[in-house]
Amino acid sequence: AGRRSVRKYRSTAVPPEILLAGAKPTIHHRSVDFPPIFNRCQEMLRKAFCSSSPVAVLAGSGTSAVEASMVSLIAPGEKVISLNSGKFGERWCKVAQAYGMQLVQVNVEWGKGVGAETFAPLLKQHPDAKAIVVTQCETSTGVVNDIQSIASLTRQSGTLLIVDAVSAFLAEPME
């Protein structure tokens, strides 16, 4: 008999020892045992995100995190430039529309990656854009977009950059 495993969305294997850890009693967030664990997790997350700032931890899906970021940072009526190059990019465009953001949709052939060269002319055309929303690795196609060049562009322009890094986190550079 081989090892058994549980597979979750996108065929992510969950090792049995992780499943067993989930069966242990939880530590209440107001107990004296919780702060040291939380602080250690914050240190590790800051290192993973290359950040000196605290990292927000959300209990939800990747979609909930990107949607929360968009809704928290972009008000209805404000302009957002959103890359649609796959299923998740398509989702961020729908989120922008659902919340009444002024959407500039960048349609790119699925399977093609982009970088700053795609967004530079758009920022000149839409200098009032509050943010650019990009999926770093489009899971539906496997394409990795050049986040470093896009981030450099947004730093120069003062435009916010919201990155869906769900499938790229710890696999692709964040700096």
Summary of predicted features, one role per range:
Residues 1-5:
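Charged, compositionally biased N-terminal leader segments and the immediate start
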Residues 6-59, 63:
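A glycine-/small-polar-enriched, mobile loop at the entrance of the PLP active site in fold-type I
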Residues 40-41, 57, 63-175:
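Conserved PLP-enzyme active-site core in the AAT-like
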